[in-house]
Amino acid sequence: MTLLSGTPRWGRERGRVTQQTTNGSPTATERITLGGGCFWCIEAVYDDLQGILSVESGYAGGQTANPTYKQVCSGTTGHAEVIDVTFDPRQIPLDDILDVFFHVHDPTTLNRQGADVGTQYRSIILYRNEAQRAAAEAAKQRAQAEWANPIVTEIAPLDTFYNAEDYHQEYFANNPYQGYCQVVIAPKVAKFRKQYAQRLKA
């Protein structure tokens, strides 16, 4: 069951995982790639957060070039369903993005989220540099204290992110009355919005 309890860690002092400009301020944007089950679900969550500039659903972590949704669903490509998150680290640090990640899906179930089963639904963080890798490992350790079972989230370098087909983008926003959206995504998003109300976009 997805953990959506406990006190969010907003405001806790941590080192921000950002590059620095010549004047010492963080760069304008960063990107991190995350997989936590069906990308429709996790995309809907991150779309709501302050500081998130864009969320793209796609595929990564496997060996097949330019995979299709059908190929990824077959479980033969090695890819996971993921989202590529572009964010402003001056508004939301990577640490907070990663803490949300470990709260909005179950990182203790191997290759599964609820009824969605297969390696394409695995929990995964794909980093772009050493600072992101270190942040991911630290977030995983923080999250483990809140879960009774071992966290199985894979942490690996990003090779290539492939955008999913257009109809997958903003799927929940565009299809709120579709069956899966009503039964699975809507309750998840409602719980998330209640817990993180102070950090939602206006």
Q: Could you tell me what each predicted segment is?
A:
Residues T2-A202:
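Flexible coil/turn and secondary-structure edge motifs
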